[in-house]
């Protein structure tokens, strides 16, 4: 099984924490992951607010690939409607050169109105821009050339330099939290990325849809998804549920605040109507109900309990890759460090013994 670290770069939930401390703590945890046998370092792209602030994950990965030469690096994800497709392709190709093919390129379309406003763009165009830009980028990393006649991106034919050296297929990831994003991921030949934020039986239809579409479009089995997780690993169960709920609950609150999830704007924006329906459900169950669902999806407690939860997940959704975060929702650094070290000692070796999915090999 492939296990990565998810780097969130969040300051929400801590009192009087500086941006420097946020970054220092994330980089320390990344070093532990790299030294402990994790397979990949993943980083988000977010801007402007305490929720998360990693404005250029490709730039970050250029640093991490030099500092940690034995581990893959990944973007989860580059938000394409805020980018120029040519610049993304060039930076990805350059990073692949520096890392000798260790880049995993994850892409997404964005959800926070505040971030779209900051980049002087509109959520209403995000689906079209994502689909157009993603196709341009992936094709250019296959062929070495980029050209497009729009409608959103008019790009004269240019060569990608440094020329792509390594096949990109098998290393493409796409965030898929809505039904149309599942279709887009399948078209891209991308592994689907989904967050551990609701009970896994509710995720199964999307996973099955992606697998079916992938095989119909490309003639090979679709790769298992990457689940982006949140973890609190403890030596005993004494108090584990209480403080796990504290940190995970704070992270849930940060999502509601950052994404304005109780607002009515999703129903008015093209391409986000599926979120409006989910928000109505959220209003019915309330914030505590949402936290309950998050706690069911994420993993917490002793290594034995965490392994049992992963086994239950695999029984529901099948094989999956993992990218888990240990620092979120006000988690003190000492707690996050103990958590990842115990996870690396007791959980990681067992997960790595799980057989690698045949679908992954076929996709590559």
Where do the language-model regions lie?
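Hydrophobic faces of well-ordered beta-strands that scaffold small-molecule active sites
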Residues: 3-7, 41-43, 73-76, 103-107, ...
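Short, acidic/polar
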Residues: 20-32, 176-183, 305-312
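N-terminal beta1-alpha1-beta2 module of alpha/beta enzyme domains
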Residues: 1-73, 168-170, 361-364
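An alpha-helical appendage that flanks or caps ligand/catalytic pockets
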Residues: 5-7, 35, 124-161, 201-319, ...
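Glycine-rich, proline-tolerant flexible connector loops at the mouths of alpha/beta enzymes
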Residues: 40-61, 79, 197-200, 325-336
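Internal, glycine-rich beta/alpha segment that forms the wall or movable "lid"
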Residues: 1, 84-190, 201-219, 362
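Conserved, mostly hydrophobic/aromatic
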Residues: 37, 45, 64, 95, ...
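Active-site mouth loops of central-metabolism enzymes
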Residues: 9-24, 78-86, 166-176, 294-303
